[in-house]
């Protein structure tokens, strides 16, 4: 019998407890419950309620076999979190990591539980979303300001230039197209043909979150207390993170399509950093391309996308026309 509840991916409490008791300090731990946290769309992420343990709650993240950000390496995420501990970016502490798949069927992490709410989707609570936006922009800027070499994050890979980083990101998305059943999709191939030979203007390399969507930023009131989901972290052009957020703002209806310089997040980010973001049309197109591939990936793996293919067609077509 499987140790995983197949429909949800949630492991049986007894199996988690058995593993926990192998850890120093958790020898008498009891698992009172394992509950799926439903906001994540890649790693299986659960809240574990504990008694007779150093903490009363923790987060369990289990590496998936397949998904929209494949290939996965959750132990890499653990290393990112350990290197970010003590920096200006608040992240959950790593309580333990496990590479042996015999326990829960795949490698996994046990993380500190941060009792805080993530930013809401703008269509669900625009007032709170707008109130959190300045702190959110400042948080993304603070990630990009980290001295990633001093923090020991060069293990993430160091492209020879920001332009090479951009190309590598496009190629990584293209490698998923066959598995996602969209290798022959005309619009995505047109985007790939346009993006691959394009060289963005010079820009510094920075630590990029890789998936800076608002659901990964935790707030108490309007104070940021945690940044989670670092599976896609990389050293690249920081405009990559901004391009994702501009693209998501269009898909969620938080900002109308227009010059990126008029996007509220771009303006707040620029105010926080004192830098002007150039060539954002290119980075918007690159992320609309990726989100088009993600759309097909979700379909393949049985998740109904929250945005439509018609939206992708409209936005990506307009974006490519600007290049």
How does the language model describe each region?
Residues 228-233:
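Activation of the activation-loop gatekeeper triad in protein kinase-fold domains
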Residues 1-27:
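Juxta-kinase regulatory segment immediately upstream of eukaryotic protein kinase catalytic domains
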Residues 239-274, 287-304:
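Active-site activation/catalytic loop segments of kinase-like enzymes and analogous catalytic loops
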Residues 205-207, 225:
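Conserved protein kinase catalytic-loop anchor
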Residues 35-187, 200-204:
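ATP-binding pocket architecture of kinase catalytic cores
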Residues 207-209, 214:
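Catalytic-loop of the protein kinase fold
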Residues 295-323:
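Helical subdomain adjoining the active site within ATP-dependent kinase catalytic cores
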């Amino acid at each position: 019998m499987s140790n995983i509840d197949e429909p949800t991916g949630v492991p049986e409490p007894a199996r988690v407890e058995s593993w926990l008791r192998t850890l120093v300090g958790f020898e008498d731990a009891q698992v009172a419950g394992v509950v799926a946290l439903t906001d994540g769309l890649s790693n299986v992420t659960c809240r574990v309620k504990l008694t007779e343990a150093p903490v009363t709650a923790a987060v369990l993240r289990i590496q998936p076999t397949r998904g929209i950000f494949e290939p996965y390496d959750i132990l890499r995420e653990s290393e990112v979190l350990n290197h970010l501990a003590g920096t200006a970016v608040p992240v959950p502490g790593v309580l333990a990591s496990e590479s042996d798949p015999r326990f829960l069927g795949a490698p996994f992490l046990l993380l500190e539980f941060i009792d805080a709410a993530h930013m809401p989707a703008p269509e669900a609570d625009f007032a709170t979303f707008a109130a959190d936006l300045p702190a959110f922009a400042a948080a993304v800027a603070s990630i990009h300001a980290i001295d990633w070499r001093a923090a020991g994050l060069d293990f993430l890979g160091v492209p020879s230039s920001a332009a090479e980083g951009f190309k590598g990101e496009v190629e990584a998305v293209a490698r998923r197209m066959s598995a996602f059943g969209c290798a022959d999709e005309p619009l995505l191939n047109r985007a790939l043909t346009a993006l691959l030979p394009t060289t963005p203007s010079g820009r510094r390399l920075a630590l990029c979150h890789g998936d800076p969507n608002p659901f990964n930023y935790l707030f108490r009131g309007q104070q940021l207390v945690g940044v989670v989901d670092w599976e896609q972290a990389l050293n690249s052009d920081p405009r990559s993170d901004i391009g994702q957020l501009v693209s998501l703002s269009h898909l969620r209806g938080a900002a109308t399509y227009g010059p990126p310089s008029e996007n509220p997040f771009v303006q707040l980010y620029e105010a926080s950093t004192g830098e002007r973001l150039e060539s954002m049309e290119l980075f918007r197109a690159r992320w609309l391309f990726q989100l088009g591939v993600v759309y097909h990936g979700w379909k393949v793996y049985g998740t109904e996308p929250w945005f439509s293919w018609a939206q992708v067609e409209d936005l990506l077509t307009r974006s490519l026309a600007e290049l």
